[in-house]
Amino acid sequence: MNPVRNLVPEIRAFRPFLPAKDYETSLRFYKAIGFKAYPLGDTMAELSLGPHAFLLQGYYVKEWADNMMTHVLVEDVDMWWRHIDSLDLTNQFGISPPSAPRGEPWGLTVAYITDPSGVLWHFAETTKLDGKKP
């Protein structure tokens, strides 16, 4: 028996709020990547990939957006990279070019993408300490 389970009620979902400087542009950006959007009002939507989701809101604070990072652990970061690279996100949305996957010292291979509001996304895959995929 898990003693923590007895003390803390279980949760059904964990969905962070992400800022959108221009809500419609951000919504199109995430849809282009492959997120499904479920509107929750004029300037809020739940965006999901499978069972994982976040809430996009039409609210923006530069300091928050520029310091926000989101981590997505995937099975095959190279496959994700080919998908992301094929979308030409820089020309479509005026963002900095996404960074191709690279091995990081903390044991992950990570591709980096910055959304139109400045939120940094890490698409990552676990690697062995020798830098090779398991």
Name each model-derived stretch.
Residues 9-12, 62-67, 104-105:
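Short glycine-enriched loop/turn motifs at secondary-structure junctions
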Residues 36-74, 120-125:
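Conserved short beta-strand elements that form part of the metal-binding/catalytic scaffold
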Residues 1-25, 70, 126-134:
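N-terminal beta-strand motif that seeds the catalytic metal site of vicinal oxygen chelate
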Residues 23-26, 88-95, 134:
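Short, positively charged
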Residues 58, 104-105, 112, 123-130:
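Short beta->alpha transition motifs characteristic of CBS
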Residues 10, 17-54:
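Core segments of cupin and vicinal oxygen chelate
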Residues 70-120:
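Vicinal oxygen chelate
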